[in-house]
Amino acid sequence: LAMADATGAELIPGLASILETEAPGVSIQVLPLTTRDPRPMLDDESADLAAGYFPAVLADLTARAQVGKAVAFAHQRLYEGAYVCVMRHGHPLASGPLTLNRFCAARHLLVSFSGRPFGFVDEALASQGRERRVVLTVNKFFTAGEVVTRSNLLTVLPRHFVNIAGANNELVQRELPFDIPAVQVATLWHSRLEHSSAHQWLRQAVTRAAHQAFEETPPA
């Protein structure tokens, strides 16, 4: 099972509870997901299931299916993620409105699995003819939270992650001063496993864990 740390923080507690009560003889290994395209690791069986935000992959699979091409992977929506801008308490931008100009003028940290300093936030800014200055990239959401609490950098994190990661008291959350596309978190798997009873159980367990997590996540 491959997923990023922010996704795992939300899903794994519920999944562990399901394992304990319903399948105590089952073992699951969670691998770090360091790509927005997990198809190679699913194809070579490095992972049986991936959970995360895969916009380009899902768009490609949908396009292939629409023109009648073979599609070797299946997917299922888990939840819609909301993202917020976060900064440390006492940050110069922590009081007062976070305007688009202030956001773009600040120094930013970006969570990037590839290390590329350009993500979906930057795509949204570019569509408005704007850009921000990314001075640091890391590949884990937990690391991003720790860095921001000890610096004047801004970062953009999943709202649910800030709420459950114990950083709520150390970070100030602000709504983004621009619109971003909906972030659809989904599971992805190779079609050869579609009818495997064990894999069907795993997919259902992950989906249930997601539903439980968002029912229990306190509002921001």
Feature names for model-found ranges:
Residues 25-29, 133-135, 172, 184-186:
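Residues at or immediately flanking beta-strands
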Residues 1-2, 50, 86, 109, ...:
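Short, well-ordered beta-strand segments
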Residues 53, 60, 87, 93-100, ...:
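Secondary-structure junction motif
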Residues 34-38, 43-47, 53, 113-172:
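Hydrophobic hinge/microswitch elements
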Residues 11, 84, 94, 100, ...:
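A late-sequence structural motif
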Residues 61, 68-82, 142-191:
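Beta-alpha-beta core module
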